[in-house]
Amino acid sequence: MTFEWWFAYLLTSTLLSLSPGSGAINTMTTSINHGYRGAAASIAGLQTGLGIHIVLVGVGLGTLFSRSLIAFEILKWAGAAYLIWLGIQQWRAAGAIDLHTLAQTQSRGRLFKRAIFVNLTNPKSIVFLAALFPQFIMPQQPQLAQYLILGVTTIVVDMIVMTGYATLAQRIAAWIKGPKQMKALNKAFGSLFMLVGALLASARHA
């Protein structure tokens, strides 16, 4: 793989990570409600889920999801239901502003697992990776090394972008002055979770 080819993938991966989705929403809500440490656990979970998708694509299971309507639909509806459930929980969250106390309500391990599930149940991610990776793989060169390069690039880029979203969320949290504002913010992010879940439910198999 040439540097130019890798750089083209780097730009593509960056644009994709910057696009707001369930991962970004999950990172921002976790950062606001549980601080940087909670956000770090969430980001680690997202990258673990993304890494699993990359491995599945590497062993050929990504093609299964891109070609099998049943597999795609099962994962799609599971993901949509989970995001909508998260949205309802966020919508109903109390308007607490003591972030130190709020951070104790969920362990970082639980936030980590939640983020893994957010990424794993997104069929569009694995289908897109299955379609994208082959476009940047040079058949005349060792494919495993190229998959590793693309996979590591994808995870590092997404981790940096999600860290940016977490930092942005902390800036937003600094503007919150009372429980009413916090509750309104929880409702806003809850609505976004449900919207993304609804959009995922409406996604069609390519």
Curated annotation (Swiss-Prot):
<feature type="transmembrane region" description="Helical">
    <location>
        <begin position="68"/>
        <end position="88"/>
    </location>
</feature>
<keyword id="KW-1003">Cell membrane</keyword>
<dbReference type="InterPro" id="IPR001123">
    <property type="entry name" value="LeuE-type"/>
</dbReference>
<comment type="function">
    <text>Conducts the efflux of homoserine and homoserine lactone.</text>
</comment>
<keyword id="KW-1133">Transmembrane helix</keyword>
<keyword id="KW-0812">Transmembrane</keyword>
<protein>
    <recommendedName>
        <fullName>Homoserine/homoserine lactone efflux protein</fullName>
    </recommendedName>
</protein>
<keyword id="KW-0472">Membrane</keyword>
<dbReference type="Pfam" id="PF01810">
    <property type="entry name" value="LysE"/>
</dbReference>
<comment type="similarity">
    <text>Belongs to the Rht family.</text>
</comment>
<feature type="transmembrane region" description="Helical">
    <location>
        <begin position="117"/>
        <end position="137"/>
    </location>
</feature>
<feature type="transmembrane region" description="Helical">
    <location>
        <begin position="5"/>
        <end position="25"/>
    </location>
</feature>
<dbReference type="GO" id="GO:0042970">
    <property type="term" value="F:homoserine transmembrane transporter activity"/>
</dbReference>
<dbReference type="GO" id="GO:0005886">
    <property type="term" value="C:plasma membrane"/>
</dbReference>
<feature type="transmembrane region" description="Helical">
    <location>
        <begin position="45"/>
        <end position="65"/>
    </location>
</feature>
<feature type="transmembrane region" description="Helical">
    <location>
        <begin position="148"/>
        <end position="168"/>
    </location>
</feature>
<keyword id="KW-0813">Transport</keyword>
<feature type="transmembrane region" description="Helical">
    <location>
        <begin position="182"/>
        <end position="202"/>
    </location>
</feature>
<dbReference type="InterPro" id="IPR004778">
    <property type="entry name" value="Homoserine/Threonine_efflux"/>
</dbReference>
